[in-house]
Amino acid sequence: MEKREEITKRMKIILEKMKNTEKEKVREMERSYEQTWDVAVAGGGVSGTAAAIAAARCGARVLILEQNGYLGGTLTGCGVGPMMTFHAGETQVIKGIMEEIVQRLVKRGYSAGHVHDTTRYISYLTPFSAEGLKLILDEMTEEAGCEVLFHTFIGEVE
């Protein structure tokens, strides 16, 4: 009986050491991921991604937190398209990074560019390949130096 109690006691000590070791490993992992950014963007939809690219191009250290495994939000993941708000009548009013995205899509064959809408619902629309847009957004965020965390939900901000 004494031998059994001694073995049990030793096993408890070993298990406690293992538990402490695992806790320390977790703490070490948490410490290794402690970083700071100038800008954190909640959501890598097209607007969030464009904002992140703009901030990174201005020299900010940028982190995009995206719940899906891709950038572009509903434009790339939900079949929302074509893009339709670049023009007010015949005047193009949306330019900048969004126009750069369209030009890259056109150059790679993922879009025909801004096309006159013959139904007169809107003046121009911009059809595109959702998979092509995902690729372009990935490339542009990488070029700008943005860091992206996919499959990430925001639970708390300090």
Identify the function of each model-found stretch.
Residues 42, 65-66:
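The conserved SAM/SAH-binding core of class I Rossmann-like methyltransferase domains
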Residues 48:
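N-terminal Rossmann-fold NAD(P) dinucleotide-binding loop
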Residues 3-19, 23-29, 54, 60-61, ...:
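Conserved N-terminal/central alpha/beta ligand/cofactor-binding core
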Residues 33-45:
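Beta1/beta-strand and adjacent pyrophosphate-binding region of the FAD-binding site
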